Amino acid sequence: MANYTGANVITAGDVTKYQPDAFGFGIASTDTEAVNFFAQTTNDILRQLRVEWWQTYKTNIFTDITILNTAEMVDTKVNLDQFERAGVYLFLGRFLCPALTKFRPETEKDRFERMGEFYMSEYNKEWRTILEDGVEYDETGDGTIQVSEREPLHGFRRLTR
């Protein structure tokens, strides 16, 4: 089932599939801090989509050039299920691990700094792969993704040289 609900990209269960002990270091999955991290992960993914992908999509899809500057991405039309792995990596790398680290510049990096760097690297790879494969955006709002509604970053309809 595709996630068009506007709910968060990931849940605590998704995180523990990739890092089973993630919530065993002092921040529980139900803590306000973790709940805020889940919401911020979703917001960051949607913002990055608007910045990196939406311009290509609307240029390739909308034929009426008068609406190109006014067309906004509708968050609930993005299938967030395709961002689960990227969301977990972003949650761990940008939010959870930095919240747990000691950040002592005079010493070696601690476990959480190294984990944060690893997960951000994995996030960047996963993000690129999703954009190259094609973002699922339900333009018609019918709850299904047609071939024409899956737009890669480079665009199918663009001449590439």
Residue ranges and their predicted role:
Residues 75-83, 102-103, 107:
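Short acidic, glycine/proline-enriched loop segments that cap or flank alpha-helices
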Residues 4-6, 27-28, 93-161:
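Short loop/turn elements at secondary-structure junctions
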